[in-house]
Amino acid sequence: CYVAGDRDDAYYHAVIDAYLEEELKLAQWGQFSVLGHLTLPVRCINEMRHKAISFQPHMAQIEEILRTIIPKGIGIECNTNRGNTPLPDADILKLYRSLGGEIITLGSDAHVTNHLGCAIPARQELLRDCGFRYFTTFDRMKPSFQVL
């Protein structure tokens, strides 16, 4: 993820809006099992540009995306983000669950081997705290629910 230069917060929120518009198009298309990296722009902006941008102003867009994928049986990924802030955060995970979302996978975002499986137990606990009882694995695009 690349975010150009040091800009004001309005610029970064415009980047997030554009990203979420594309995520919504992807959700409407719906030919996949799990939507990953839902909150990627915030991670990139906050980590690379040392900002504290929040997804709160974009929750209506997030909710629209979630309301689009849930009836299609599409899940979301809970990414451990290398042990940093989980992606998405607890607010979005709780929203997904409250809307009826059940399919949730765990990813470690391992770009290097020492991040492989990083923080999975902590994210399992987070999922339990957000109301999930299972996480999902797939075999040939068929979901299988594993007890948390």
Which residues does each predicted region cover?
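Charged catalytic cores and adjacent phosphate/nucleic-acid-binding surfaces used
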Residues: 50-148
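Extended substrate/RNA-proximal surfaces in nucleic-acid metabolism proteins
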Residues: 1-71
